[in-house]
Amino acid sequence: MSPLAKDLDDNQIVDLAAYYGRLFRGAIDPAESGRYVGIDIENIVSNGDVARRLPPCAACHQVRAGGPIETPTLTGQYAQYLEAQLQAFAGGRRHNDIYHRMRSVAAKLTPNEIRMLAIRYSGQ
């Protein structure tokens, strides 16, 4: 990239940065960002929510987390796909989870939490 980038002027660099910044998978549209105020998604990922009997996502889905062998790593998956699958688990439309684990977990998440988790895992 260096041979190509060395001839760019400051405006071209800014334009390229803006272009690539918009390509971030799962970015939140600023118009809808108010829907997510007060959601601590990192806490749900790392610690879960004891009050709702919600286990931490990272306990099973983090790379080398040591979760059940059938548990997929979510890092880098497309946000739209993750959101659709979490919604399907929550609504009982997807039922290939052993012992109903994901149906139970996803049913406890709000739609906004599902969206934020999908965005969070897609952006890693």
Question: Where are the model-predicted features located?
Answer:
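Electrostatic cytochrome c docking/interface patches
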Residues: 22-51, 72
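Gly/Gly-Pro-rich "capping" loops immediately C-terminal to redox-active cysteine motifs
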Residues: 1-8, 58, 62-91, 103, ...
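Stable alpha-helical elements in mature extracytoplasmic
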Residues: 12-13, 37, 78, 85, ...
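C-terminal capping alpha-helices of c-type cytochrome domains
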Residues: 6-28, 80, 105-124
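Generic structural signal for alpha-helix termini and adjacent loop/cap motifs
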Residues: 23-26, 47-48, 63, 92, ...
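C-type cytochrome heme-c attachment and multiheme electron-transfer modules
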Residues: 10, 44-50, 54-58, 110-113
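Alpha-solenoid repeat scaffolds
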Residues: 27, 51, 67, 93-96
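The canonical Cys-X-X-Cys-His
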Residues: 16, 20, 54-64, 117
